[in-house]
Amino acid sequence: MTSPTGVTANTEHVTVQSPDTGIAASGFTVPHEGSYQTKESRITIRLNDAVSIHAVVREPIGASGARPACLFLHGAGTGDSSEVYGDVASAMASAGIVTLVPDKRLDNYSTLHRDYPQMAEDYGRSFDTLKHWPGVDAQKTGLYAESEGTWISSIITANRKDVAFSILTSAPVVSGRQQMTMAASTYFTDSGAPRSLINDVPKLTSMDFRALGLEYANFDSTPYLSKLTQPVLVNYGTGDLSMPIAQGAQTILNQTASAGNSNVTVRYYPANHQMRTGSHLSRPGLPLESSYTRNLEDWINSVTMGATASDWSTPMIAGAQPSQRYSAPTSVSPGLISSLGVLLTLLGLALGASVLCGLCAAGVGINSRIRSRGRRSQQEESGRLPGFGQGIAAPLTLLVSLSTLSLLATLWYVGSSAVQALSLHHASVAFSGVWTVLRVAAIILVLLFGWLCSSVIAGIGHANRSSAQIRQDIRIAHGSGHQAVVLLG
């Protein structure tokens, strides 16, 4: 079913088989969280001749034998190895799993440019470092990725056959453009934004962003997921409005099934995008969902001991029941304006034209006053009016002023609506009413423009006609102009 927003209501529903997120395999006894004391080592990893990064290794103290290991991949909002994943990586280490959290390479990473294949190569260097770390079993080394990092991990698992397992948490699955269309529509709807504003979301997100860079917005990990042949654990927070929590999991299940991989476990937690509780937003200091790390560790220890799809004594899909309002569209089409660069250019031209018209209005008014002083007596004797410019300056100035204010107010409103949507604040009735005021103002501007055009048309070429004739023509033109505006509207 197509929703009023232009995106499609989600129909790929996932039904959990149990509310219990616990993970266990029959016949396998695994070390649990807290079984070991841990230690940290800060190391440097050389990515190439010019770039090196820092990393943090956490490992269990006194664990016997070669241990399973896990490399962590950053999401979009993190980069420093000392500031992220500390609680998750430490918990894993206490369950006997060696972990490595590297810095994100930032010299080739920005808001406008991201090269995911290159990032996969860089993480591959860290993966090799972890595989050869003392006490690590190279055959039991896998990946943990969140959000944007899951796009990168999907490239790694497609290109390398030595990845023992893959954990995908808060995975977008679809391209960034498609994910943003779904997320923005959901955010705006939940914040109470006007319906007409929500309808324009897909038109904006589907624009050509090449004027700003942003080519990575089109990266789609779906083809890589069909090469996921190792055990996979998929995690989503049911409070995460930014991700396709049902559609994403179903897509992963479909893609792995096409590769003959049935060892895919899915868990849903009452948590946000970062698997934390206390707020739907990603805020510092929020606690992890209480069972999250324990389930991660039990799953890793089980699959690295050889657990297959038939060995699980717990359901493959479990946890809180997910609810995804809109589907991430498989394709998006822009409106009349297909390029963000063109849109920004038109906005700039509109503001520039307003300023130019304002200067013209001022010039017409000043020139008219100067000329009228010398010809006033002659015009009064002949009963004639000057043609172009008579009475135009004031309405032209008003039109320019209102147009500029209306454009700026609209940009402010859209920006404010986006801020409220992203902060999950519901718009007040008064704020929502501003949109109605802006729409009424737009109608008034169209009428004023029609009136102004009719005045100009009636005045051009009639400088030698009498005052009474001019006024009669203007009345006729005004009526025709208003009728045209109504018909066009």
Sequence positions of predicted segments:
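Membrane-interface motif at the C-terminal end of an N-terminal transmembrane signal
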Residues: 1-9, 488-489
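Soluble extramembrane regions of membrane proteins in the secretory/endomembrane system
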Residues: 6-312
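Juxtamembrane amphipathic/hinge helix adjacent to a transmembrane helix
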Residues: 294-336
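Extended non-globular C-terminal regions
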Residues: 320-489
